[in-house]
A protein has these predicted regions:
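Protein maturation boundaries and topogenic segments
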Residues: 1-89, 165-189
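Structural motif
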Residues: 61, 73-76, 100-101, 108-110, 143, 169, ...
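RNA pseudouridine synthases
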Residues: 92-103
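Short strand-turn-strand beta-turns centered on an Asx-Gly dipeptide
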Residues: 112-115
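Short gly/ser/thr-rich secondary-structure transition/capping motifs
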Residues: 126-130
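Beta-strand-rich cores of mature extracytoplasmic or soluble domains
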Residues: 133, 137-189
Length: 189
């Protein structure tokens, strides 16, 4: 009569090894699916090829892009594709967005947007190299005007083979430098 009426003794059942393995596998599969969804729809990695973005980005660096709900703005560093360039992505800085007027004084190396000279402390040297695009030019609706930070060693919107970039060709905004590890961190200006 050690049992008091109304109380029950319940022993917790230890989960079997099979149940524990199943729980672990379910958590791993869930984590992998979540990571795949994030890297499919929100983030992407890309490598820097070439020197057109010096001094900001260097050849061989690995970058992380934000692809989720992105709206292009002046100063953003973006990765884009162009039908004429095949699958090779280009990394450039947005200088102007739709309906803005871009003018470049190649003698003085100054870029103007809507008549205002840009303060460009991020460029390697002033813009003295011209291509076949005539200035001033107005950025069409749904497009952006991009330049490399290494202005005199960059194929960008000054060249008609790149030209004004339709926003649909922007893969995403560069938000983070992954490698080299000593320079790892947020990309900003």
């Amino acid at each position: 009569m050690n049992n008091v009426e109304g109380t029950e003794t319940t022993a917790k059942k230890k989960p079997s090894l099979k149940d524990e393995v199943f729980d672990w596998m379910l958590e791993i599969v869930t984590a992998v699916v979540i990571l795949l969804l994030i890297f499919t729809f929100a983030l992407r990695t890309v490598d820097v090829y070439g020197n057109s973005m010096l001094p900001t980005l260097h050849h061989g660096e690995k970058l992380l892009l934000n692809r989720f709900l992105y709206t292009p703005e002046y100063g953003d560093i973006v990765v884009l594709t162009k039908p004429c360039k095949g699958d090779e992505p280009l990394i450039k800085r947005i200088i102007a967005t739709e309906n803005q007027t871009v003018d470049i004084d190649f003698q003085k190396g100054i870029v103007y947007v809507d008549g205002v000279a840009l303060e460009e402390n991020y460029i390697l040297e002033p813009t003295t190299r011209s291509f076949d695009v005539t200035f001033p030019c107005v950025v069409p609706e749904g497009c952006v005007f991009v330049l490399g930070d290494n202005r005199n060693n960059s194929k960008d919107s000054r060249d008609s083979t790149v030209g004004m970039v339709d926003e649909r060709y922007i893969l995403g905004e560069v938000v983070f430098r992954i490698t080299p590890f000593e320079k790892m961190g947020k990309i900003g200006w």
